[in-house]
């Protein structure tokens, strides 16, 4: 059983809450949601980010960098998972005896009275959550990425129902109070949080599913295929006649689901049809089928997930994929998109590995995932995400790709410049380029740094 957090957020209309690490996508989502609920929000982070800029524009006071003077008379402090005990603001809050909550403890207070459609899995959870938010336009939403439908990762609603992207990386999904638990896959990752114990890892997923009134699962997953309790089940054979089209110049997937007829959804790839199918099945007892079919058309994709930044002489796509399975699936989508555009350009990949631990844990899979649809591989330095640097010979491990190694990429108008030691070594003016990574590559590709 989970231990109920001792500190609960109450009376949000009068509550003053300070967020440490407010620029992160998960923490910023909670900050936006609680502000909309009536709380007074402040925060801090180590650097300016788009989320910080957005919150500042809403009138939120944010300190860059962390500053103990920012801790005054708040009712509670909420911090991201990467914030350590020796953080100066944490120490000041302890001195003032202000209650301190981790993000996952705060979730309990925020979600405990909500009817939550909670989506969790190694891959696809952001897309499924955003698809559900399109299907349920009157529900609130907290997503781990920006939905292009409403240009935010949060949508406030007076409705008690909420679609929520849950996080398995720190087991916070167990605090999400799922009315409906939607799980597309359970591929092991973030095992350091589970003491590298697979039994403990899968038990967490089982607990998550067991405590939901409604469960929607993809039975092709090795763990989920053996789940024995009642669940709405999706299998690969349930999805038929997958086709890819350009609709108003935008990539779409059409498919037939079970005996429910045909659906159309933004995006490309079999995984896209699978994600949409899980969202549809989650909504069947909530809405009329035709309303689901029509509302799904409002899904316009999410930022950093096959995010088409430009499509002129240089086709440029930004994608958050940072795991070999995700990269492989997205490269297939890139090939489909290139075919739809009738371009003969080779697919150039710019890859920024995210975290040394993930790179080392999945090294053999990373070495294979670019084989099928990558014509040229360009490799950026590893984005450490505050991890200690490890020695790894990327040139030796990836020599079969004959890769190009650079320090950074810079957007210059409609072109991309590749830099080594601050010198431009190449300019890409035309072609098909897709960037992969969960670090700052997204800002490099967008010319935001």
From Swiss-Prot:
SUPFAM superfamilies: MurCD N-terminal domain, MurD-like peptide ligases, catalytic domain, MurD-like peptide ligases, peptide-binding domain. GO terms for molecular function: ATP binding; UDP-N-acetylmuramate-L-alanine ligase activity. It is an enzyme of class 6 (ligase). ATP binds at residues 121-127. The keyword Cell cycle applies. Its EC number is 6.3.2.8. The keyword Signal does not apply. Pfam families: Mur_ligase, Mur_ligase_C, Mur_ligase_M. Cell wall formation. Belongs to the MurCDEF family. Signal peptide: none annotated. GO terms for biological process: cell division; cell wall organization; peptidoglycan biosynthetic process; regulation of cell shape. GO terms for cellular component: cytoplasm. It catalyses: UDP-N-acetyl-alpha-D-muramate + L-alanine + ATP = UDP-N-acetyl-alpha-D-muramoyl-L-alanine + ADP + phosphate + H(+). It is found in: Cytoplasm. Keywords: ATP-binding, Cell cycle, Cell division, Cell shape, Cell wall biogenesis/degradation, Cytoplasm, Ligase, Nucleotide-binding, Peptidoglycan synthesis. Pathway: Cell wall biogenesis; peptidoglycan biosynthesis. This is UDP-N-acetylmuramate--L-alanine ligase.
